From Swiss-Prot:
Residues 21-114 are annotated as: V segment. This is T-cell receptor alpha chain V region RL-5. SUPFAM superfamilies: Immunoglobulin (SSF48726). GO terms for biological process: adaptive immune response. It comes from Oryctolagus cuniculus. InterPro entries: Ig-like_dom, Ig-like_dom_sf, Ig-like_fold, Ig_sub, Ig_V-set, TCR_variable_region.
């Protein structure tokens, strides 16, 4: 009788795209290295000829991307886990801020744009944030 064991590892990759169907997202280039307790600003600017929704995703080491913040309303400040961002349409921006970083904030951060009712996301290239001990 033949017996075989097989181990399969599935790796999911997030591919970042700067420009999709006339839309583009640019964000702070990384890596960004800051000390614990420092403040953070990651810039995100977009271009699109359509109305859109903006998002920040975070991807921790060995994990998939997770939604951090989303904006559906202009000039509304969104907050989660100490992070905040405001969609400023006149500046085409959705900058991510945190006043006091923790070591656990080390991750890759992606700004994303979804055009109107479309399910397609246009992603920034991602910004690696490394938070170090003081």
């Amino acid at each position: 009788m033949f017996s075989a064991s097989c181990s399969v590892t599935v790796v999911v990759l997030l591919i970042t795209v700067r420009r999709t169907n006339g839309a583009s997202v640019t964000q702070t280039e990384g890596p960004v290295i800051l000390s614990e307790g420092s403040s953070l600003t990651l810039n995100c600017n977009y271009q699109t000829s359509y109305s859109g929704f903006l998002f920040w995703y975070v991807q921790y080491l060995h994990e998939g991307p997770q939604l951090l913040l989303q904006s559906t309303t202009e000039n509304q400040r969104m907050e989660h886990q100490g992070f905040h961002a405001t969609f400023v349409k006149k500046d085409s921006s959705f900058h991510l801020h945190k006043s006091s970083l923790q070591l656990s904030d080390s991750a890759v951060y992606y700004c994303a744009l979804r055009r109107g009712a479309s399910n397609k996301l246009t992603l920034g290239t991602g910004t690696l944030l490394k938070v170090e001990l003081n």
